[in-house]
């Protein structure tokens, strides 16, 4: 475990390792992003990225096939795209179509190309495609009228020949909103936008985070966490089937849950909340979810 102390002057909101686990990006209310080189249990600050005019909520690394690229989102309503070349970081693009805080940013599975999913308090989600000539082509969707707190891509599906399906029609994502709802969206070629496929009801307060498990199985798994102090696991046995709701545990958590994150293999779920703990959960053979440990500093 690497402990990075005194990295920022204010609260840290996100910390994400790159594809190879060698670089760590952190972001904070101090309006900065910091890039660290991580080696074993040691770390070294490489650069501090400035450009946002408000707290920076989240960061996400693009797949390395697109280069060393990072996206960040902020209370200032902007998404900034950063790139490292020859050891130097620079800002290469600004996505500024939202009129309120941008709360979530995530690159799509690389099979879909350089696509970015953005969620905002203005109630909208934007999907931004970065073209080779440097232009962008955003699709903007009215998702949750009183604000979108989080959005997460579904993994690229596997075809019968074992290859990943990178077609537009297979693109899906989930959103969580301040209307207490979880919504599933799918690309529609005729409409040339993402259309609502399912609305999932189960929370009694704001949905703070949603996470689609990266496992490419017949069954799809989603996790949603809420201000209501619950985590719901949603499962779908096949693409045409209904979504089934399972409370992760019957009793409520001690405090609001802020974040949910799946392991790369998709079999362990990490939750963090207002009690400053990170708890790990696994599904047992009976389909029940049980604690798999806590992460301690």
Swiss-Prot record:
Outcome, altering residue 262 to R: Growth inhibited above 30 degrees Celsius
- Keywords recorded for this protein, A-Z: Cytoplasmic vesicle, Endoplasmic reticulum, ER-Golgi transport, Membrane, mRNA transport, Nuclear pore complex, Nucleus, Protein transport, Repeat, Translocation, Transport, Vacuole, WD repeat
Q: Which SUPFAM superfamilies match?
A: WD40 repeat-like
Q: What InterPro entries does this protein's entry cite?
A: Sec13/Seh1_fam, WD40/YVTN_repeat-like_dom_sf, WD40_repeat_dom_sf, WD40_rpt
* Biological process (GO), any one: positive regulation of protein exit from endoplasmic reticulum
UniProt cross-references to Gene3D superfamilies, sorted A to Z: YVTN repeat-like/Quinoprotein amine dehydrogenase
Q: Which SMART domains match?
A: WD40
Which GO molecular function annotations are given, in alphabetical order?
A: structural molecule activity
Q: Give residue ranges of the WD repeats.
A: 7-46, 51-92, 97-138, 143-195, 202-244, 252-291
PROSITE patterns found in the cross-reference section: WD_REPEATS_2, WD_REPEATS_REGION
Give the membrane topology, semicolon-separated if more than one: Peripheral membrane protein
Mutagenesis or variant effect for residue 176 to R: Leads to mislocalization of NPCs and overproliferation of the nuclear and ER membranes at 34 degrees Celsius
**Intracellular or extracellular location(s):** Cytoplasmic vesicle, COPII-coated vesicle membrane; Endoplasmic reticulum membrane; Nucleus, Nuclear pore complex; Vacuole membrane
Task: Cite a GO CC annotation.
Answer: nuclear envelope
Say if the entry is tagged with keyword Acyltransferase: no
Q: Does the keyword Membrane apply?
A: yes
* Pfam families the UniProt entry points to: WD40 (PF00400)
Recite the other comments.
Present with 21400 molecules/cell in log phase SD medium.
Function description: Functions as a component of the nuclear pore complex (NPC) and the COPII coat. It is one of 5 proteins constituting the COPII coat, which is involved in anterograde (ER to Golgi) double-membrane transport vesicle formation. First the small GTPase SAR1, activated by and binding to the integral ER membrane protein SEC12, exchanges GDP for GTP and recruits the heterodimer SEC23/24, which in turn recruits the heterotetramer SEC13-SEC31. The polymerization of COPII coat complexes then causes physically the deformation (budding) of the membrane, leading to the creation of a transport vesicle.
Q: How does it assemble?
A: The basic repeat unit of a COPII coated vesicle is composed of 5 proteins: the small GTPase SAR1, the heterodimeric SEC23-SEC24 complex, and the heterotetrameric SEC13-SEC31 complex. This repeat unit polymerizes to induce membrane deformation into a transport vesicle. Component of the nuclear pore complex (NPC). NPC constitutes the exclusive means of nucleocytoplasmic transport.
The family note in this entry says: Belongs to the WD repeat SEC13 family.
Protein's UniProt name: Protein transport protein SEC13
Instruction: Write the lineage as a comma-separated list.
Output: Eukaryota, Fungi, Dikarya, Ascomycota, Saccharomycotina
